[in-house]
Amino acid sequence: MKTRLLFFVGLLVVATNSFSQNAKDNAVYNAPVVQEQKLNLTNEWDKTFPKSSKVRHKKITFHNRFGITLAADMYIPKNTTSTRNASGKLPAIAVSGPFGAVKEQASGLYAQTLAERGFLTIAFDPSFTGESGGIPRNVASPDLNTEDFSAAVDYLSTNELVDADRIGILGICGWGGLAINAAANDPRIKATVASTMYNMTRVNTNGYFDKGTAEQRYQMRVELSKQRTEDYRNGSYKRSVMNPKPAADAPQFMKDYYDYYKTKRGYHERSINSGQGWNLTSNLGFMNSQILQYAGEIKNAVFIVHGEKAHSRYMGEDAFKLLKGDNKQLYIVPGASHCDLYDKVNVIPFDKIEQFYRTYLVNK
Protein backbone atom coordinates (compact mmCIF):
# COMPACT_ATOMS: atom_id res chain seq x y z
CA MET A 1 0.00 0.00 0.00
CA LYS A 2 2.83 2.34 0.93
CA THR A 3 4.62 1.52 -2.33
CA ARG A 4 1.45 2.20 -4.34
CA LEU A 5 0.94 5.53 -2.55
CA LEU A 6 4.49 6.61 -3.29
CA PHE A 7 3.94 5.64 -6.94
CA PHE A 8 0.84 7.84 -7.23
CA VAL A 9 2.61 10.71 -5.45
CA GLY A 10 5.41 10.35 -7.97
CA LEU A 11 2.93 10.50 -10.86
CA LEU A 12 1.35 13.61 -9.36
CA VAL A 13 4.75 15.31 -9.09
CA VAL A 14 5.58 14.42 -12.71
CA ALA A 15 2.18 15.65 -13.91
CA THR A 16 2.49 18.88 -11.92
CA ASN A 17 5.98 19.52 -13.25
CA SER A 18 4.79 18.74 -16.76
CA PHE A 19 1.85 21.16 -16.45
CA SER A 20 4.16 23.80 -14.99
CA GLN A 21 6.63 23.33 -17.83
CA ASN A 22 3.85 23.50 -20.43
CA ALA A 23 2.61 26.72 -18.86
CA LYS A 24 6.12 28.15 -19.02
CA ASP A 25 6.48 27.01 -22.62
CA ASN A 26 3.17 28.61 -23.53
CA ALA A 27 4.10 31.79 -21.71
CA VAL A 28 7.34 31.98 -23.68
CA TYR A 29 5.58 31.14 -26.93
CA ASN A 30 2.90 33.77 -26.42
CA ALA A 31 5.37 36.49 -25.46
CA PRO A 32 6.52 38.84 -28.21
CA VAL A 33 9.82 37.45 -29.49
CA VAL A 34 10.68 40.10 -32.08
CA GLN A 35 10.23 43.83 -31.97
CA GLU A 36 10.73 45.15 -35.46
CA GLN A 37 13.16 48.00 -35.90
CA LYS A 38 11.60 51.24 -37.08
CA LEU A 39 13.21 51.88 -40.45
CA ASN A 40 13.64 55.18 -42.21
CA LEU A 41 11.89 54.44 -45.51
CA THR A 42 11.73 56.80 -48.45
CA ASN A 43 8.31 57.84 -49.70
CA GLU A 44 9.17 59.18 -53.13
CA TRP A 45 9.45 56.98 -56.21
CA ASP A 46 13.24 56.57 -56.46
CA LYS A 47 13.43 53.48 -58.67
CA THR A 48 15.58 53.01 -61.75
CA PHE A 49 12.46 52.14 -63.77
CA PRO A 50 9.17 53.98 -64.40
CA LYS A 51 6.17 53.48 -62.14
CA SER A 52 3.36 51.38 -63.59
CA SER A 53 -0.24 52.55 -63.56
CA LYS A 54 -1.41 48.92 -63.53
CA VAL A 55 -0.34 48.18 -59.96
CA ARG A 56 -0.63 49.62 -56.47
CA HIS A 57 2.65 50.17 -54.67
CA LYS A 58 3.44 50.50 -50.98
CA LYS A 59 6.36 50.07 -48.60
CA ILE A 60 6.28 47.21 -46.11
CA THR A 61 8.59 45.70 -43.49
CA PHE A 62 9.01 42.21 -42.08
CA HIS A 63 11.58 40.41 -39.95
CA ASN A 64 13.67 37.28 -40.26
CA ARG A 65 14.33 34.71 -37.54
CA PHE A 66 17.54 36.51 -36.59
CA GLY A 67 15.43 39.51 -35.60
CA ILE A 68 16.55 41.74 -38.47
CA THR A 69 13.88 43.97 -39.98
CA LEU A 70 13.78 44.01 -43.77
CA ALA A 71 12.35 46.68 -46.05
CA ALA A 72 10.41 45.85 -49.19
CA ASP A 73 8.30 47.33 -51.93
CA MET A 74 4.96 45.59 -52.42
CA TYR A 75 3.29 45.59 -55.83
CA ILE A 76 -0.39 44.65 -55.99
CA PRO A 77 -2.21 44.15 -59.31
CA LYS A 78 -5.12 46.57 -59.68
CA ASN A 79 -7.41 44.63 -61.98
CA THR A 80 -7.02 40.89 -62.09
CA THR A 81 -9.35 37.94 -61.71
CA SER A 82 -7.48 35.18 -63.53
CA THR A 83 -4.98 34.57 -60.74
CA ARG A 84 -7.26 34.88 -57.70
CA ASN A 85 -8.55 31.81 -55.88
CA ALA A 86 -12.17 31.27 -54.85
CA SER A 87 -11.62 33.44 -51.78
CA GLY A 88 -10.19 36.25 -53.86
CA LYS A 89 -6.63 35.75 -52.65
CA LEU A 90 -3.60 36.14 -54.90
CA PRO A 91 -0.51 34.06 -55.57
CA ALA A 92 2.60 35.88 -54.35
CA ILE A 93 6.26 36.09 -55.34
CA ALA A 94 9.20 37.43 -53.31
CA VAL A 95 12.03 38.89 -55.40
CA SER A 96 15.60 39.88 -54.56
CA GLY A 97 18.92 40.52 -56.28
CA PRO A 98 21.22 41.03 -57.96
CA PHE A 99 23.88 40.43 -55.32
CA GLY A 100 24.84 43.86 -54.01
CA ALA A 101 21.85 45.62 -55.58
CA VAL A 102 18.80 47.19 -53.93
CA LYS A 103 15.07 46.78 -54.47
CA GLU A 104 14.95 49.99 -56.49
CA GLN A 105 16.98 48.29 -59.23
CA ALA A 106 16.42 45.01 -61.10
CA SER A 107 14.41 43.18 -58.43
CA GLY A 108 11.85 45.97 -58.34
CA LEU A 109 11.51 45.88 -62.11
CA TYR A 110 10.87 42.13 -62.04
CA ALA A 111 8.42 42.49 -59.15
CA GLN A 112 6.43 45.29 -60.76
CA THR A 113 6.28 43.49 -64.11
CA LEU A 114 5.00 40.28 -62.53
CA ALA A 115 2.43 42.28 -60.57
CA GLU A 116 1.19 43.69 -63.87
CA ARG A 117 0.62 40.06 -64.86
CA GLY A 118 -1.53 39.21 -61.85
CA PHE A 119 0.80 38.30 -58.99
CA LEU A 120 1.19 40.09 -55.68
CA THR A 121 4.93 40.67 -55.38
CA ILE A 122 7.48 42.09 -53.00
CA ALA A 123 11.03 43.17 -53.82
CA PHE A 124 13.13 43.33 -50.67
CA ASP A 125 16.50 44.63 -49.55
CA PRO A 126 18.56 41.87 -47.93
CA SER A 127 19.71 42.09 -44.33
CA PHE A 128 22.31 44.79 -43.63
CA THR A 129 21.76 46.50 -46.99
CA GLY A 130 19.64 49.20 -48.61
CA GLU A 131 16.77 50.34 -46.41
CA SER A 132 16.74 47.10 -44.41
CA GLY A 133 18.01 46.91 -40.86
CA GLY A 134 20.98 45.18 -39.31
CA ILE A 135 24.34 46.30 -37.99
CA PRO A 136 27.04 46.35 -39.24
CA ARG A 137 26.12 47.50 -42.70
CA ASN A 138 27.04 45.95 -46.04
CA VAL A 139 27.49 42.38 -44.80
CA ALA A 140 26.53 39.24 -46.72
CA SER A 141 26.21 35.65 -45.54
CA PRO A 142 24.97 32.55 -47.39
CA ASP A 143 23.02 31.37 -44.35
CA LEU A 144 21.52 34.74 -43.49
CA ASN A 145 20.64 35.61 -47.07
CA THR A 146 18.99 32.24 -47.65
CA GLU A 147 16.98 32.97 -44.50
CA ASP A 148 15.91 36.34 -45.92
CA PHE A 149 13.93 34.54 -48.63
CA SER A 150 12.19 32.32 -46.08
CA ALA A 151 11.44 35.39 -43.96
CA ALA A 152 9.71 36.92 -46.99
CA VAL A 153 7.66 33.72 -47.23
CA ASP A 154 6.79 34.07 -43.52
CA TYR A 155 5.41 37.52 -44.22
CA LEU A 156 3.52 36.57 -47.37
CA SER A 157 2.05 33.44 -45.74
CA THR A 158 0.36 35.62 -43.12
CA ASN A 159 -0.72 38.46 -45.41
CA GLU A 160 -4.51 38.68 -45.82
CA LEU A 161 -4.23 39.28 -49.57
CA VAL A 162 -2.14 36.17 -50.23
CA ASP A 163 -3.00 32.51 -50.73
CA ALA A 164 -0.39 30.90 -48.47
CA ASP A 165 -0.36 27.74 -50.58
CA ARG A 166 0.68 29.66 -53.70
CA ILE A 167 3.95 31.42 -52.90
CA GLY A 168 7.03 31.54 -55.09
CA ILE A 169 10.37 33.32 -55.11
CA LEU A 170 12.63 34.83 -57.76
CA GLY A 171 16.34 35.50 -57.39
CA ILE A 172 18.52 37.47 -59.78
CA CYS A 173 22.29 37.00 -60.20
CA GLY A 174 23.78 35.88 -56.85
CA TRP A 175 20.30 35.75 -55.42
CA GLY A 176 19.39 33.16 -58.04
CA GLY A 177 21.65 30.63 -56.35
CA LEU A 178 20.35 31.70 -52.96
CA ALA A 179 16.77 31.27 -54.19
CA ILE A 180 17.46 27.67 -55.16
CA ASN A 181 19.16 27.16 -51.81
CA ALA A 182 16.09 28.55 -50.04
CA ALA A 183 13.79 26.29 -52.06
CA ALA A 184 15.84 23.28 -50.95
CA ASN A 185 15.25 24.22 -47.32
CA ASP A 186 11.70 25.58 -47.41
CA PRO A 187 8.91 23.44 -48.95
CA ARG A 188 6.47 26.36 -48.61
CA ILE A 189 8.16 27.78 -51.71
CA LYS A 190 6.08 26.22 -54.47
CA ALA A 191 7.88 27.73 -57.49
CA THR A 192 11.38 29.21 -57.83
CA VAL A 193 12.92 31.23 -60.66
CA ALA A 194 16.67 31.86 -60.82
CA SER A 195 17.49 34.49 -63.44
CA THR A 196 21.06 34.97 -64.72
CA MET A 197 22.20 33.16 -61.59
CA TYR A 198 25.51 33.05 -59.77
CA ASN A 199 26.51 30.46 -57.22
CA MET A 200 28.19 32.94 -54.87
CA THR A 201 29.89 30.31 -52.72
CA ARG A 202 31.38 28.67 -55.80
CA VAL A 203 32.71 31.84 -57.38
CA ASN A 204 34.08 33.14 -54.07
CA THR A 205 35.80 29.83 -53.41
CA ASN A 206 37.04 28.93 -56.88
CA GLY A 207 37.13 32.23 -58.74
CA TYR A 208 35.55 32.79 -62.15
CA PHE A 209 35.37 29.68 -64.32
CA ASP A 210 36.78 27.63 -61.40
CA LYS A 211 40.34 28.75 -62.12
CA GLY A 212 41.28 29.34 -58.48
CA THR A 213 43.70 27.03 -56.67
CA ALA A 214 43.90 25.77 -53.10
CA GLU A 215 46.99 27.91 -52.53
CA GLN A 216 45.20 31.02 -53.78
CA ARG A 217 42.31 30.28 -51.42
CA TYR A 218 44.73 29.90 -48.55
CA GLN A 219 46.42 33.21 -49.29
CA MET A 220 43.02 34.91 -49.51
CA ARG A 221 42.09 33.48 -46.11
CA VAL A 222 45.37 34.78 -44.69
CA GLU A 223 44.65 38.28 -46.01
CA LEU A 224 41.03 38.29 -44.88
CA SER A 225 41.95 37.02 -41.43
CA LYS A 226 44.48 39.85 -41.12
CA GLN A 227 41.73 42.22 -42.20
CA ARG A 228 39.52 40.96 -39.38
CA THR A 229 42.21 41.95 -36.90
CA GLU A 230 42.57 45.37 -38.48
CA ASP A 231 38.81 45.91 -38.55
CA TYR A 232 38.52 45.04 -34.88
CA ARG A 233 41.44 47.27 -33.97
CA ASN A 234 40.05 50.19 -35.98
CA GLY A 235 36.45 49.73 -34.92
CA SER A 236 35.31 49.89 -38.55
CA TYR A 237 35.11 47.62 -41.57
CA LYS A 238 37.20 48.01 -44.69
CA ARG A 239 35.06 47.80 -47.80
CA SER A 240 35.65 46.56 -51.30
CA VAL A 241 35.84 48.82 -54.33
CA MET A 242 32.85 47.91 -56.47
CA ASN A 243 32.79 48.11 -60.26
CA PRO A 244 35.56 50.64 -60.92
CA LYS A 245 35.79 51.98 -64.45
CA PRO A 246 37.20 49.05 -66.42
CA ALA A 247 40.29 49.19 -68.59
CA ALA A 248 39.88 48.96 -72.34
CA ASP A 249 41.04 45.33 -72.32
CA ALA A 250 38.86 44.27 -69.37
CA PRO A 251 36.43 41.36 -69.85
CA GLN A 252 33.13 42.43 -71.38
CA PHE A 253 31.13 41.38 -68.33
CA MET A 254 33.09 43.85 -66.17
CA LYS A 255 32.24 46.60 -68.63
CA ASP A 256 28.61 45.49 -68.49
CA TYR A 257 28.58 45.69 -64.69
CA TYR A 258 29.99 49.22 -64.82
CA ASP A 259 27.43 50.22 -67.43
CA TYR A 260 24.55 49.04 -65.27
CA TYR A 261 25.63 50.08 -61.79
CA LYS A 262 27.65 53.24 -62.42
CA THR A 263 25.62 55.01 -65.10
CA LYS A 264 22.14 56.49 -65.25
CA ARG A 265 20.89 53.15 -66.54
CA GLY A 266 20.94 51.47 -63.13
CA TYR A 267 22.80 53.61 -60.59
CA HIS A 268 21.26 53.94 -57.14
CA GLU A 269 22.85 55.67 -54.18
CA ARG A 270 21.96 52.91 -51.71
CA SER A 271 23.29 50.12 -53.92
CA ILE A 272 26.47 48.42 -52.75
CA ASN A 273 27.40 47.73 -56.37
CA SER A 274 26.93 51.37 -57.31
CA GLY A 275 29.65 52.46 -54.92
CA GLN A 276 29.23 51.61 -51.24
CA GLY A 277 31.09 48.29 -51.41
CA TRP A 278 30.83 45.11 -49.34
CA ASN A 279 32.69 44.63 -46.08
CA LEU A 280 35.72 42.68 -47.29
CA THR A 281 35.42 40.00 -44.63
CA SER A 282 32.00 38.95 -45.98
CA ASN A 283 33.94 36.72 -48.37
CA LEU A 284 34.97 34.43 -45.51
CA GLY A 285 31.46 33.06 -45.05
CA PHE A 286 31.08 32.33 -48.74
CA MET A 287 34.46 30.58 -48.90
CA ASN A 288 33.72 28.26 -46.01
CA SER A 289 30.34 26.86 -47.03
CA GLN A 290 28.67 25.74 -50.21
CA ILE A 291 25.06 26.38 -51.17
CA LEU A 292 23.05 24.01 -53.43
CA GLN A 293 24.17 20.93 -51.46
CA TYR A 294 20.56 19.75 -51.31
CA ALA A 295 19.28 21.14 -54.60
CA GLY A 296 18.59 17.61 -55.78
CA GLU A 297 16.03 17.21 -52.99
CA ILE A 298 13.81 20.09 -54.14
CA LYS A 299 10.40 18.61 -54.92
CA ASN A 300 8.70 21.83 -56.02
CA ALA A 301 9.14 23.56 -59.36
CA VAL A 302 12.32 25.41 -60.42
CA PHE A 303 12.98 27.47 -63.56
CA ILE A 304 16.53 28.61 -64.38
CA VAL A 305 16.89 31.39 -66.96
CA HIS A 306 20.27 32.32 -68.41
CA GLY A 307 21.73 34.30 -71.26
CA GLU A 308 23.39 32.54 -74.17
CA LYS A 309 26.39 34.89 -73.98
CA ALA A 310 26.47 35.31 -70.19
CA HIS A 311 29.87 34.70 -68.57
CA SER A 312 27.94 33.11 -65.69
CA ARG A 313 25.99 30.67 -67.85
CA TYR A 314 27.98 27.68 -66.61
CA MET A 315 26.73 28.27 -63.07
CA GLY A 316 23.10 28.11 -64.16
CA GLU A 317 23.61 25.03 -66.30
CA ASP A 318 25.50 23.23 -63.54
CA ALA A 319 22.79 24.10 -61.02
CA PHE A 320 20.18 22.68 -63.38
CA LYS A 321 22.09 19.38 -63.53
CA LEU A 322 21.64 19.05 -59.77
CA LEU A 323 17.85 19.27 -59.98
CA LYS A 324 15.57 16.25 -60.25
CA GLY A 325 12.02 15.83 -61.49
CA ASP A 326 9.98 16.84 -64.52
CA ASN A 327 8.97 20.17 -62.94
CA LYS A 328 12.46 21.63 -63.46
CA GLN A 329 13.24 23.80 -66.50
CA LEU A 330 16.23 25.56 -68.04
CA TYR A 331 15.87 28.28 -70.66
CA ILE A 332 18.81 29.92 -72.44
CA VAL A 333 17.91 33.36 -73.81
CA PRO A 334 19.36 33.70 -77.33
CA GLY A 335 22.05 36.36 -77.62
CA ALA A 336 21.64 37.64 -74.05
CA SER A 337 24.50 38.61 -71.75
CA HIS A 338 24.45 38.41 -67.95
CA CYS A 339 23.40 42.03 -67.39
CA ASP A 340 20.88 42.03 -70.24
CA LEU A 341 18.66 40.05 -67.87
CA TYR A 342 18.81 42.79 -65.25
CA ASP A 343 16.66 45.39 -66.96
CA LYS A 344 16.21 44.88 -70.69
CA VAL A 345 12.50 44.16 -70.78
CA ASN A 346 12.63 43.15 -74.44
CA VAL A 347 15.22 40.48 -73.56
CA ILE A 348 14.04 39.16 -70.18
CA PRO A 349 11.64 36.28 -71.03
CA PHE A 350 8.76 37.57 -68.92
CA ASP A 351 6.20 35.58 -70.92
CA LYS A 352 7.98 32.33 -70.09
CA ILE A 353 8.46 33.33 -66.44
CA GLU A 354 4.77 34.22 -66.17
CA GLN A 355 3.76 30.93 -67.74
CA PHE A 356 5.96 29.02 -65.29
CA TYR A 357 4.37 30.75 -62.31
CA ARG A 358 0.88 30.29 -63.74
CA THR A 359 1.55 26.58 -64.16
CA TYR A 360 2.76 26.04 -60.61
CA LEU A 361 1.06 28.81 -58.62
CA VAL A 362 -2.21 29.46 -60.48
CA ASN A 363 -3.22 26.30 -62.34
CA LYS A 364 -1.98 23.86 -59.70
Task: Walk through the language-model features, giving the residues of each.
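N-terminal cap/lid segment of alpha/beta-hydrolase-fold proteins
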Residues: 34-88, 342
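Alpha/beta-hydrolase-fold enzymes
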Residues: 180-263
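Short beta-strand/loop motif that positions the catalytic acidic residue
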Residues: 298, 304-306
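Catalytic histidine-centered segment of alpha/beta-hydrolase-like enzymes
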Residues: 336-347
